[in-house]
From Swiss-Prot:
Name of the protein this chain belongs to: ATP synthase subunit b 3
Recorded topology in the membrane: Single-pass membrane protein
One Gene Ontology term of the molecular function aspect: proton-transporting ATP synthase activity, rotational mechanism
Primary role: F(1)F(0) ATP synthase produces ATP from ADP in the presence of a proton or sodium gradient. F-type ATPases consist of two structural domains, F(1) containing the extramembraneous catalytic core and F(0) containing the membrane proton channel, linked together by a central stalk and a peripheral stalk. During catalysis, ATP synthesis in the catalytic domain of F(1) is coupled via a rotary mechanism of the central stalk subunits to proton translocation. Component of the F(0) channel, it forms part of the peripheral stalk, linking F(1) to F(0).
Subunit structure: F-type ATPases have 2 components, F(1) - the catalytic core - and F(0) - the membrane proton channel. F(1) has five subunits: alpha(3), beta(3), gamma(1), delta(1), epsilon(1). F(0) has three main subunits: a(1), b(2) and c(10-14). The alpha and beta chains form an alternating ring which encloses part of the gamma chain. F(1) is attached to F(0) by a central stalk formed by the gamma and epsilon chains, while a peripheral stalk is formed by the delta and b chains.
Classification via CDD domains: ATP-synt_Fo_b (cd06503)
Pfam family, one: ATP-synt_B
Keywords on record: ATP synthesis, Cell inner membrane, Cell membrane, CF(0), Hydrogen ion transport, Ion transport, Membrane, Transmembrane, Transmembrane helix, Transport
Subcellular location: Cell inner membrane
Classification via HAMAP family: ATP_synth_b_bprime
One cellular-component annotation, GO: proton-transporting ATP synthase complex
Family as reported in the entry's similarity comment: Belongs to the ATPase B chain family.
InterPro entries the UniProt entry points to: ATP_synth_b/b'su_bac/chlpt (IPR002146), ATP_synthase_B_chain (IPR050059)
Length: 160
């Protein structure tokens, strides 16, 4: 058997396979270890990215809640401002209407006073004209002298 070349080929083949196996096992083991390390790093990176994404999502949700609260505050402030403007406009309108009513009442009072004055003036004019006509119709020279004499006699008493 030691003389048989097939035996030595078999021994050489087994030694070759063992050497290749040892080298290949180390290389394959190292390659598998490297690949496992890369996979572990990728998993860690994926977990880190997931945590970052969750943090970003939480931050976005906080910002969205804050934005909604701010929008609600802005809407509430706008409503308050609109109510304040509406109340001020109503107050201003009411004051304006009161002023216009007072002005109208004043104009009406002035017109009434003017009308009353015109009626009085007209009544005085009519009374003077009627008195003049009556005096012209009823006066004669003797009566005229008596009235003038009486008026002159009463004059010193009225002056003192």
């Amino acid at each position: 058997m030691l003389q048989n070349p097939t035996f030595w080929v078999l021994v050489a083949f087994v030694l070759f396979v063992a050497a290749v196996w040892r080298i290949a096992a180390n290389t394959i083991g190292k390659a598998l270890d490297d690949r496992a390390e890369r996979i572990r790093e990728e998993i860690e990176q994926a977990q880190k990215l997931r945590e970052d994404a969750q943090a970003a999502l939480a931050q976005y949700q906080r910002k969205q809640r804050d934005a909604l609260k701010e929008a609600e505050n802005i809407i509430a402030a706008a409503r308050e401002e609109a109510d304040r403007i509406r109340r001020r406009a109503a107050t201003d309108l009411e004051a304006s209407l009161r002023r216009r009513e007072a002005q109208a009442m004043e104009k009406i009072a002035q017109a009434e006073a003017q009308a009353v004055q015109q009626v009085r003036d007209l009544a005085v004019d009519i009374a003077v004209a009627a008195t003049e006509r009556i005096l012209v119709q009823n006066m004669d020279a003797t009566r005229d002298e008596v009235l003038v004499g009486n008026a002159i006699a009463e004059l010193p008493a009225k002056l003192h």
